[in-house]
């Protein structure tokens, strides 16, 4: 260890510098010295000395965190005796020093929790030494309040620690520990926590007593941690909060059948200070979410009745709900009433009429206070959305009263949004419409709520729309209206158009009537009339948010009323015909296209409107019938014949253009490409006519590149725009005839320009990314469009260009040197990822015979593959899995290489082969199922190749095996641990994890077993012996059945038999392991 940290005094100084100094360089030096200390051999003994003799809290904190790191490491772990000593020392230390700084106490409790979790299956003299959790804390709980707080904190932190997966240890190990803890300790901890809460609530809590408050807070946290435990290993995503079900074990039934448990938390809510109430409500949210199957029907009805009574009591005494945290948790609680119970069950609760009235009043009041806790409104709208959606299915005879209250909620939402406009403009507040995600979420919920009692919703919207539209028109006609008043009306109309779009989008075909379709027509007519008014003013002024709301409505209208599945007799079209003369879908499409062209003309420099407009055009061009109707429109023919910057300003190139702002051009040309293809056939003249603007752009670029002093920025902008346009066309041309015309147009005339650009600007991802993505599109044999004639060399020529581009880019990008972590993906890894995708598409496209390259001495294939290897070796293993797009492109390419180019893989240097095998080994446990499945496939190809080569080498007849095969065999024989590790990993996943791709896992497993029969036999014995004695015979039998009837070959019939056996094996193993805790060392089996 370095000199500066030899003494405790110096360690104390370094801790002080680390945590207190404001000088960055001093802090960094201290951090560096302390990192050296952490990694030194003396760390353990010095940490104990720091805890014993350290004079500052910071040195105690350092000691606790260092010890936590030491006990957490998966390589070179501390001996069991040492970990037991540390655990005992920490408990004694906490018991003798109740006045430690809170952060030191917390760090020591974290250390205890980590040791206990990681040692959960460690045993000594047939006793699990780290499971005496309740015994460990009993001495704290029986002492003063201060000690009691420490004891409860230990249980709380331990429960939380065991519930959280740790990236440095296998997920299987985590699940086994969590399951064992759940079955052996968690219910006792929960019961203890509830009993202590009952004792605390029975006493009158002294508001001035800080330690009592701490105890109550820690008890509530502990209870919440118990209820929030991931009982069945589903790792629920917090973002799907309103769908959460708490999978309480059946053994806990008694606690929930006892109404006093539920009553305890409602009583606590009303009796304790408001700052504790959010945690109480969080516990109630979890209790309200217990799985339905925990109860029979009568028990569930009784439980729901108590729950609804508690909610009613809170609504009748709502004073504490003025606190935002209480309000938020209470809204979550209300949402759980419907996510976990059916409307038919709710209406049977005795107080339902009164409760639904109170909830409606609460919701209306909440919506009227739109500026207060907008994120909490989501839960209220979620409740009403679910209630409204259930109305058609409710069978109960009791009235649900939603026809009374749902319109009130709809009205409150609509009117409150309109009233907010003036206040936001007047006071300069943040406009909710700026948060598109939140608004869309609320509108999705309103779409269902508003369709309930739809006639009332429509009447309200028509009345409010007519008022605002009339006022708006009068203000415009006056010519001198204050801008504030205009802005208010435009804001109100924006909300109304969004809401109209939402309720139209909420139409459900089986529950809609002609009358409702006619109402939709009434609403759409008004919006189209408003559009005519606003479009007529675009030359002078326009409102971006209002335009975006109209595009939102058009998108909803398209989904519901345009397309192959829509009944053309819809009353909506009759209403449009009566009012606006729009008799059918074609005439409405004409309006849409007119609006699209208008937007592109006037809003070409407004990215949000341009991208939304082009997305609408793109969506319209996908429908089979709508695209054929569109092509007949004169406006569409105009677009096909005039797609230049003169008519569409967003296609223009100027010095203000940002290279990344051109993405929408791809969308535009994808739509145009689809429209062109409808009648294109093999008409080369029509194709040439369409491509004229792009031809001119390429010719201009060629002239620039030929001159020595061209404007680089202008050339980049022209090229990126052109390449994005071409990618859109290439994507749309998925028929052979049209794609061949495009290929003949770009090759060989313009391909050199793309290659030259890669050479010049390889370091600028704004240029290289679009070019590489275009190449990926050109080599992608989508819909078998790349089927060249037998006399055509075009397939090979295309691959040569591909190889040249990958090699040029790859060799140059590797010259960039070390890059900052935050720029690594953008500047390097993204380009490498696309190169992998290009190569994968080319190799798997089935239009090139790759055998001819070596035969004729063509180095294109070899160059591309060697570049792949160079690029791969420049990427650390961790980055391969850290960046999802890179993972997917690499593993899908590797799948193709191992399937069709195994001789190339076998010829690689040993360190490259080991790199690839390591990447497969790590990918087998990836969270991304696509990556995991790809790795299984790669491993299967490699194992099959190995098996075949070994089989051949065992036979004396025939030609000798190729040299690379022998080298590959030799490498694998030198490193058997790699294949053995993968065998244990695959078996581990199949036996112990939630294996979502069992078939894929089964394919390489047979080959792995046949290649490692001795290792498999040892592994099998280890697994069997790790089971409790009474389960060992059953596990032994499972393995016997797995290999029953399996021969020593990899023929298809034998593989299929093994796959069937494996399904049965997995079922039997799971049945065998149910209700049993695994033996002490089973978790170490393959970790």
UniProtKB/Swiss-Prot annotation:
One of its GO terms (molecular function) is small GTPase binding. Keywords: Cytoplasm, Nucleus, Protein transport, Transport. Residues 30-96 form the Importin N-terminal domain. This is Exportin-7-A. Pfam families: IBN_N. GO terms for cellular component: cytoplasm; nuclear pore. Expressed in oocytes (at protein level). Coiled coil: none annotated. InterPro entries: ARM-like, ARM-type_fold, Importin-beta_N, XPO4/7-like. Belongs to the exportin family. It comes from the Eukaryota. GO terms for biological process: protein export from nucleus. Mediates the nuclear export of proteins (cargos) with broad substrate specificity. It is found in: Cytoplasm; Nucleus.
